[in-house]
Amino acid sequence: MKKWQNIRKVVLAYSGGLDTSIILKWLQSTLDAEVVTFTADLGQGEELELARRKAEMLGVKEIYIEDLREEFVRDFVFPMFRANTVYEGAYLLGTSIARPLISKRLIEIAKETGADAIAHGATGKGNDQVRFELSAYALNPDIKIIAPWRDWDFKSRTDLFEFARMHQIPVEKDQQGEAPFSVDANLLHSSSEGKILENPALPAPEYVHIRTLSPEDAPDQATRITLGFKKGDAVSINGKNLSPATLLAELNRYGRDNGIGRLDLVENRFVGMKSRGFYETPGGTILLAAHRAIESLTLDRGAAHLKDELMPRYAELIYYGFWFSPERKMLQAAIDLSQEHVEGEVTLKLYKGNVIVEGRQSKKSLYSSELVTFEDDQGAYDQRDATGFIKLNALRLRTLARRCQGNQEKK
């Protein structure tokens, strides 16, 4: 290809799966370029040495496989959860939040190895192409980016299978012996798309679920846990301090066993189309419920309501790929400031797909039992003060009502 004719070395975001293995071979054969592979361990639960062996089989000399789980949760997942972030009221952004970190390392490795370009396996129809590339350009405005799905002649995954067969690239099968769903996974979630899921009228088959038990098959006995928070981040489970990645992995285990975190969603992609995906976010679902509970105790009403107003915009920025944008950083600064006193413990009951808050406590609590009691408050609150409060707040409403009455009388 003429537009890539001067490229001699490319860093490829490589999962070891079918798509990126074909891309690796395509880059080698089409561009005659040396390919460096980068595989990020974000807690996807796969055997990453398999990716190394596949890369070696395809002739790759420089292979990067890095454990980024702690950085992923500490610097990306937790900051996002401080905002109680959900996209379109439901999606916990498990795929979206992983892309900036992968792009960051692609740019760094390109610099370390003297590569001319980076490459990714995102299709030309999806959000990930935008997320990868916006993040990369934010960190290196001059980087060259190769997106094979937008350049090659393959039109479908069937074409990919034929290319793989011709070049003896192994093709994975699902539990039914067929080509697998399009799956993305990390420590926060897993997502499945394609095949039968492309019809939003049909239910997802049970074998699609890879992270959770069915709620019907979950234990009949509830599980109770206590989650500890400091400055808005979860720091402990049942009194035991854990690192960010270890804590999320433990929450995933609790969520998996109790059938928590399944989501069947039709969402609006950034590129303009609607898509249907099936998501499993067991630990994240528990974390969100607990964080909202501790905030309810420690966050001032005005700050809490402002956060709720800002959150959809913040979620949209992450979903669209603007993690490194100035506006996301501005919002993050405000969100982080709001978390200064968000600390304490939340007790949760996990039962057959449900996360039920049973209690919350904090040394920084704004809750006053003296003020809200139905019993004698010993003078903590004078109910007669409410009369003036109501009159002042009703002033404009009464003025408007009188105007309406006057207009009706004139008729």
From Swiss-Prot:
Matching PROSITE patterns: ARGININOSUCCIN_SYN_1, ARGININOSUCCIN_SYN_2
Domain of life: Bacteria
Main subcellular location of this protein, as a coarse class: cytoplasm
Catalytic function, reaction form: L-citrulline + L-aspartate + ATP = 2-(N(omega)-L-arginino)succinate + AMP + diphosphate + H(+)
UniProt GO BP: argininosuccinate metabolic process; L-arginine biosynthetic process; urea cycle
Keyword list, A-Z: Amino-acid biosynthesis, Arginine biosynthesis, ATP-binding, Cytoplasm, Ligase, Nucleotide-binding
A GO CC term attached to the entry: cytoplasm
Binding-site positions, ATP: 13-21, 40, 121
Keyword field contains ATP-binding: yes
Binding positions (L-aspartate): 123, 127-128
Pathway involvement of the protein, from the record: Amino-acid biosynthesis; L-arginine biosynthesis; L-arginine from L-ornithine and carbamoyl phosphate: step 2/3
UniProt-listed Enzyme Commission number(s): 6.3.4.5
One Pfam family here: Arginosuc_syn_C
Location in or out of the cell: Cytoplasm
Residues given in the record as L-citrulline binding sites: 91, 96, 127, 131, 182, 191, 267, 279
Alphabetized GO MF terms: argininosuccinate synthase activity; ATP binding
Entry keyword annotation includes Ligase: yes
UniProt-listed InterPro entries: Arginosuc_syn_C, Arginosuc_syn_N, Arginosuc_synth, Arginosuc_synth_CS, Arginosuc_synth_type_1_subfam, AS_cat/multimer_dom_body, Rossmann-like_a/b/a_fold
Quaternary structure (record): Homotetramer.
Family: Belongs to the argininosuccinate synthase family. Type 1 subfamily.
Protein known as: Argininosuccinate synthase
Organism expressing this protein natively: Bartonella tribocorum (strain CIP 105476 / IBS 506)
Gene: argG
